[in-house]
Amino acid sequence: ACFPKAAVREGKTADANLAASLNHMLSAPYIDANILGYGFDMVSMLVHELQVQLPMLQNYPTEEKLSSYDRYLIGCLLIQQLLKWHLVDSTYTCPYIPVYQMKFPTILEECRKRFQFILDHGYDTPEKVRFLLEHFIQINHLEDTLEVSEA
């Protein structure tokens, strides 16, 4: 799992949010993949998430006005949703794409590359997840903020 290097009690709640977003980006689709075979209605859950998250995304300013923190969180959300919708139907276009094309085109392109990297590498073992977490910490220049731990 990914953790902030400084304790939340030291006022580093933003760091904790960054770590949680990165962890959730990979863990939520992994969990969803494992419950699909048990009759779980994934599409209903994804549609509900869409109804909650799209209005929130539409309230954000365009990407040139976003803080680096918000860019990161919005990017993690899209990658997570791309992975989840890919589980349902790999040929289906994720319904988040039109909003990202309109408001966050650069973030969208970055996320598409990262999504493909995740698919190419896989995220179905602890070793693969650790590699991905370390990779995303590095490419986002968060080495001073986040670290990967076994705990």
Which residues make up each language-model segment?
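Pan-zinc metallopeptidase signature
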Residues: 43-151
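Internal, conserved structured core segments that host functional sites
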Residues: 25-47
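Post-HEXXH active-site segment of zinc metalloproteases
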Residues: 1-29
